[in-house]
């Protein structure tokens, strides 16, 4: 009896040892994904916003006067950029299904960097519009394309934090661009006969080029593409075949029968996902109207603030955006009953306050500074809505690519005329129409997010499944590695049952 007990104890120790080693291996894989996937997409988005916000910083730092830009020229150039962004959105996302993302995203980064360099030679407003259009074609690969990539590597509980870090990287780029322009104007203005704003575009390119090269060499693309271990990529030295296999299997099973063909369009259109997520991000994107149209920088210029102040003060909006985005991600990842729609409704309430404050006293510096900085909270919507769409559309690869791209495309399509109608540069300092527009989109986005949650619950009930289940627990897999996982996944199974019970309980009270 003693011998048998000793044998059982030894077996338990061995199991604990195996489990511990396996857990360390999982953590190591997640670390590698963060190091080589998340790092590249964040660097790409960071320089994307350095380049993009750099245009506005150049405008208020001498470009307007040097190129004799007048009236709504800034707004028109931004609209031209948005048109290019819209045109490239869906094709870029679909290209990720045909061309390895390592190649396509790196190429697009290099291409828009080269066009940014061309901006230092512009001599007219027409040159600006032409370059900005093609810049946008390539830059449109970044935002929705990255959310597609993140959804291919990360599980539901991992997505909010990574989406928030990604969003935050763009906001850091926005802040960095303002400080960099201030420094460039101070130290390089007039050097070699070039104005400070021209030097900004040159330096932007010098930063963009190494990021494109880094992506081509180290970015692994998608876990289910054999190109991830191409001879031209260092990825084969970073991820082994077993790790790539596990990276695919740790996510929920997809419907492998779906293909990118003519059946894709009716398949996507007959579901509510495409319609509702496109609508909610049209509204959520316009909640950023005051921030995305550089209204604070224009207000500072109108009120005769110094050049350094015009470049630096708007950075506070992006700082608030970073904090609010990270806080919302932590809330959704760590709080058991947290829901995406909770954050959406909170953003709606905050943006209503912003609209009321600016409309009430648009010339009071204390009110305007407070409202503009508070408006940075709307940036949290990027991580919230796109991670939500990633989760709901995960089972259909082609649908997910189209939905994520369409969200950004329709938001851009509306913003192309919305900014002219409500946030034109000649409406400074009051932006009266913009306040009413923000009030409408803030309230509407909150309502639509509640509707999406209702549809999600109804869909989960009809499928009789948990929204997101670890694929390692799916039946029909018999390799040794996964059998070993199954021995140690009892706790995970219990958690899934608990989540399922909680999901079913929500049917009677869906908005708790």
From Swiss-Prot:
Stretches with biased composition (Acidic residues): 475-496
Alphabetized Gene3D superfamilies for the sequence: MFS general substrate transporter like domains
Cytoplasmic side: 1-27, 101-102, 154-164, 220-271, 334-342, 394-401, 456-512
Its membrane topology: Multi-pass membrane protein
Pfam family, one: MFS_1
CDD domains assigned to the protein according to its UniProt record, in alphabetical order: MFS_FEN2_like
GO cellular component, one term: cell periphery
GO biological process: endocytosis; pantothenate import across plasma membrane; pantothenate transmembrane transport
Keywords carried by this UniProt record: Cell membrane, Membrane, Transmembrane, Transmembrane helix, Transport
Region Disordered: start-end pairs: 468-512
InterPro entries with a match to the protein in the record: MFS, MFS_trans_sf
Cellular compartment(s): Cell membrane
Transmembrane segments: 28-48, 80-100, 103-123, 133-153, 165-185, 199-219, 272-292, 313-333, 343-363, 373-393, 402-422, 435-455
Entry GO MF terms: pantothenate transmembrane transporter activity
Keyword Iron-sulfur: no
Protein function: Transports pantothenate into the cell. Also involved in the catabolite repression-mediated regulation of ergosterol biosynthesis and in fenpropimorph resistance.
Similarity comment text for this entry: Belongs to the major facilitator superfamily. Allantoate permease family.
Further details from the record: Present with 3060 molecules/cell in log phase SD medium.
Protein name per Swiss-Prot or TrEMBL: Pantothenate transporter FEN2
């Amino acid at each position: 009896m003693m011998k048998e007990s000793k044998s059982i104890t030894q077996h338990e120790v061995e199991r604990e040892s195996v489990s511990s080693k396996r857990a360390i291996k999982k953590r190591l894989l997640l670390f590698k994904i963060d190091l080589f996937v998340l790092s590249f997409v964040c660097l790409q988005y960071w320089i994307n916003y350095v380049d993009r916000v750099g245009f506005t910083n150049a405008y208020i730092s001498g470009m307007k006067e040097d190129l004799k830009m007048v009236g709504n020229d800034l707004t028109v150039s931004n609209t031209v950029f948005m048109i290019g962004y819209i045109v490239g959105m869906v094709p870029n996302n679909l290209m990720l299904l045909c061309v390895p993302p390592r190649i396509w995203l790196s190429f697009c980064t290099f291409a828009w960097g080269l066009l940014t360099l061309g901006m230092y030679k512009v001599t007219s407003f027409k040159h600006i519009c032409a370059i900005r259009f093609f810049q946008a074609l390539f830059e449109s690969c970044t935002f929705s394309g990255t959310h597609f990539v993140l959804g291919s590597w990360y599980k539901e509980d991992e997505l909010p934090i990574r989406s928030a870090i990604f969003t935050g990287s763009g906001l850091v780029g926005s802040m960095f661009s303002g400080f960099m322009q201030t420094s460039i104007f101070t130290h390089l203005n007039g050097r070699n006969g070039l104005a400070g704003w021209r030097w900004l575009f040159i330096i932007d390119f010098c930063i963009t080029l190494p990021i494109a090269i880094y992506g081509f060499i180290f970015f692994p693309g998608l876990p289910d593409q054999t190109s991830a271990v191409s001879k031209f990529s260092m990825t084969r030295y970073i991820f082994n075949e077993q790790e790539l296999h596990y990276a695919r299997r740790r996510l929920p099973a997809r419907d492998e029968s779906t293909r990118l063909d003519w059946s894709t369009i009716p398949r996507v259109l007959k579901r509510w996902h495409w319609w509702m997520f496109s609508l909610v991000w049209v509204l959520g994107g316009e909640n950023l109207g005051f921030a995305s149209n550089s209204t604070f920088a224009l207000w500072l210029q109108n009120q005769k603030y110094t050049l350094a102040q015009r470049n630096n003060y708007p950075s506070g909006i992006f700082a608030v955006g970073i904090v609010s985005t990270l806080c919302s991600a932590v809330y959704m990842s760590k709080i058991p009953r947290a829901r995406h729609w909770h954050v959406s409704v909170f953003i709606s309430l905050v943006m209503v306050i912003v609209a009321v404050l600016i409309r009430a006293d648009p010339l009071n510096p204390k009110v305007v500074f407070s409202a503009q900085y508070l408006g940075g909270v709307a940036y949290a919507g990027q991580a919230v809505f796109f991670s939500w769409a990633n989760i709901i559309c995960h089972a259909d690869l082609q649908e997910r690519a189209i939905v994520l791209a369409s969200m950004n495309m329709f938001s851009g399509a509306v913003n192309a005329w919305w900014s002219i109608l409500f946030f034109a540069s000649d409406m400074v300092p009051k932006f009266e129409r913009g306040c009413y527009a923000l009030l409408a989109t803030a309230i509407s986005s909150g309502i639509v997010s509640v509707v999406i949650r209702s549809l999600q619950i109804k869909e989960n009930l009809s499928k009789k499944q948990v929204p997101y289940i670890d694929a390692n627990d799916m039946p029909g897999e018999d390799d040794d590695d996964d059998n070993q996982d199954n021995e140690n996944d009892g706790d995970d199974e219990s958690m899934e049952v608990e989540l399922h019970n909680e999901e079913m309980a929500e049917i009677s009270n869906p908005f708790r």
